[in-house]
């Protein structure tokens, strides 16, 4: 059985046409992208000529940003329309990105069957809260990571504050996101993420929260992980 939720996929299929509209359904992701890209670059010591796997790449906003920094990017997702949008936009930008419609578990099986390809950097951003089995995603990412590679996850804490900001605020009051984009029951506490990553033999190197400024339309990072947060992991042996 594939580790996906058809209802979650349907949400993003419907929003595919607006993926690259900076004022559309994915405006918050466009606003967040410079901040998370800078974080990834800092934690990974740059991206130039590094092999990167973007898990749950959607329409390719982060994939393209990393490719523009010199990374060799593979983007995987299970949605159809967003991947087509991603391929077309990358072509228009003159970027070479390998987009594939496949789950990370299936991608791992394919890599194992063909050859043991590993990645310097793996990103899985704003995805874990949309799948039935986050641990399976984490374990597959770990298996695809080079011994000295860096793995990134971002998700949403399971707190009242997160619900108030992400669901009530962003979806219903400010209408920054379509209603129903997020399911509070699927939000993930940092302790849960750290438990799963420990099971996958990963160690957390950094964790931080990211927050939105309504006046500037920009995000900033700090140590408050009570709502949105992202973290850096490596193999425990590192």
Swiss-Prot record:
The lineage of its organism: Bacteria, Pseudomonadati, Pseudomonadota, Gammaproteobacteria, Pasteurellales. Pfam families: Methyltransf_23. Keywords: Methyltransferase, S-adenosyl-L-methionine, Transferase, Ubiquinone biosynthesis. The keyword Transferase applies. Coiled coil: none annotated. S-adenosyl-L-methionine binds at residues 36, 56, 77, 125. It is an enzyme of class 2 (transferase). Belongs to the methyltransferase superfamily. UbiG/COQ3 family. O-methyltransferase that catalyzes the 2 O-methylation steps in the ubiquinone biosynthetic pathway. InterPro entries: SAM-dependent_MTases_sf, UbiG_MeTrfase. It comes from Histophilus somni (strain 129Pt) (Haemophilus somnus). It catalyses: a 3-demethylubiquinol + S-adenosyl-L-methionine = a ubiquinol + S-adenosyl-L-homocysteine + H(+); a 3-(all-trans-polyprenyl)benzene-1,2-diol + S-adenosyl-L-methionine = a 2-methoxy-6-(all-trans-polyprenyl)phenol + S-adenosyl-L-homocysteine + H(+). It comes from the Bacteria. Its EC number is 2.1.1.222, 2.1.1.64. GO terms for biological process: methylation. Pathway: Cofactor biosynthesis; ubiquinone biosynthesis. One of its GO terms (molecular function) is polyprenyldihydroxybenzoate methyltransferase activity. This is Ubiquinone biosynthesis O-methyltransferase. Gene3D superfamilies: Vaccinia Virus protein VP39 (3.40.50.150).
